[in-house]
Swiss-Prot record:
GO terms for cellular component: cytoplasm. Its main location: cytoplasm. GO terms for biological process: coenzyme A biosynthetic process. SUPFAM superfamilies: Nucleotidylyl transferase. It is found in: Cytoplasm. It comes from Yersinia pseudotuberculosis serotype I (strain IP32953). Its cofactor is Mg(2+). ATP binds at T10, F11, H18, G89, L90, R91, E99, W124, S125, F126, I127, S128, S129, S130. Belongs to the bacterial CoaD family. InterPro entries: Cyt_trans-like, PPAT, Rossmann-like_a/b/a_fold. The keyword Metal-binding does not apply. This is Phosphopantetheine adenylyltransferase. Pfam families: CTP_transf_like. NCBIfam families: coaD_prev_kdtB, cyt_tran_rel.
Length: 159
């Protein structure tokens, strides 16, 4: 049986924490779509095309991972791609409350859409794209938190 999962997010930019989760999801499911949200309301630093390109570069060795951008409701995107599993990361209790609401809304919109929650590896549990960008803006060392191509792209954006 082929199990197709979607790991959605803004990924602005993709971090080692995201990469950890997509790698683990790729071992659990036959096919994983890393779905990058347009999220123009969040005012991302990187364009959707840039985020897709960076994600493709850092997931290239994961043969069952496909990277796609999207702007529609997640339930609609899942239907269009015949996926019925959403993979989400939970770093904290506050993440759980938000994810619980999203999971229930998605299930309301698409009853067969299940959410699977993965805990990040401990060393990535405090990392977020927003935090990494803030550290970079203030000249801090971001190399431990991002794949090399992403570090290079982020530093170029800030130059």
């Amino acid at each position: 049986m082929i199990t197709k999962a979607i790991y959605p997010g803004t990924f602005d930019p993709i971090t080692n924490g995201h990469l950890d989760l997509v790698t683990r999801a790729s071992a659990m499911f036959s096919h994983v779509i890393l779905a990058i949200a347009d999220s123009s309301s969040k005012k991302p630093m990187f364009t959707l095309d840039e985020r897709v390109a960076l994600a493709k570069k850092v997931t290239a060795l994961l043969k069952n991972v496909e990277v796609l951008g999207f702007s529609e409701l997640m339930a609609e995107f899942a239907k269009k791609h015949n996926a019925n599993i959403l993979v989400r990361g939970l770093r904290s209790v506050s993440d759980f409350e938000y994810e619980w609401q999203l999971a229930n809304m998605n299930r309301h919109l698409m009853p067969k859409l299940e959410s699977v929650f993965l805990m990040p590896s401990e060393k990535w549990s405090f990392i977020s794209s927003s935090l990494v960008k803030e550290v970079a803006r203030h000249g801090g060392d971001i190399t431990p938190f991002l794949p090399k191509p992403v570090t290079k792209a982020l530093l170029a954006k800030l130059a």
